[in-house]
Amino acid sequence: MTLAKDIASHLLKIQAVYLKPEEPFTWASGIKSPIYTDNRVTLAYPETRTLIENGFVDAIKEAFPEVEVIAGTATAGIPHGAIIADKMNLPFAYIRSKPKDHGAGNQIEGRVAQGQKMVVVEDLISTGGSVLEAVAAAKREGADVLGVVAIFSYQLPKADKNFADAGVKLVTLSNYSELIHLAQEEGYITPEGLDLLKRFKEDQENWQEG
């Protein structure tokens, strides 16, 4: 079993991912979605957590061998980033969604030197907007951001465009396509549900029609 499939299996088993193609969730953006993901749940399961963190370490060593500092996005990327940094014996920092409105007004907590080669850790990629804002903040502080790693991606076309436009490399441990096919194989969804989930990936606005 590949790592992507193994992680997808864990996410389904521990209910970090819910699939309801016939009774969709409503995202904050108002989009009706057949999937809901809460990767914070992974922290409660040592076997899953270890699989993810070891996967991150291997992925970073392969894709970003020059890394000098690990940064987690607040808040979901912080625990994973801290564990990765510990495993790799690297400095750790975290990036707030916006600067503090008191004290020193920091947006990055920790110490990042000018030109230090950074990898940013996120738990989930939907459109990529929030993590790319974190990347931009890190660059403003002088970091040399090599790329982003995440547990899971919805593989939305908008995310592909956003990362391409920003010139930021993205590496994810598992993804939507891997998960929905595994879910159908293991009986979490029907073949009809799989078709709906495939349609959502291609067209988030009109996937329920037709």
From Swiss-Prot:
It catalyses: orotidine 5'-phosphate + diphosphate = orotate + 5-phospho-alpha-D-ribose 1-diphosphate. Pathway: Pyrimidine metabolism; UMP biosynthesis via de novo pathway; UMP from orotate: step 1/2. Orotate binds at residue 126. The keyword Glycosyltransferase applies. Pfam families: Pribosyltran. Its cofactor is Mg(2+). One of its GO terms (biological process) is 'de novo' UMP biosynthetic process. It is an enzyme of class 2 (transferase). Keywords: Glycosyltransferase, Magnesium, Pyrimidine biosynthesis, Transferase. 5-phospho-alpha-D-ribose 1-diphosphate binds at residues 96, 100, 102, 122-130. Its EC number is 2.4.2.10. InterPro entries: OPRT, Or_phspho_trans_dom, PRibTrfase_dom, PRTase-like. One of its GO terms (molecular function) is magnesium ion binding. Homodimer. Belongs to the purine/pyrimidine phosphoribosyltransferase family. PyrE subfamily. Catalyzes the transfer of a ribosyl phosphate group from 5-phosphoribose 1-diphosphate to orotate, leading to the formation of orotidine monophosphate (OMP). This is Orotate phosphoribosyltransferase. It comes from Streptococcus pneumoniae serotype 19F (strain G54). The lineage of its organism: Bacteria, Bacillati, Bacillota, Bacilli, Lactobacillales. The gene is pyrE.
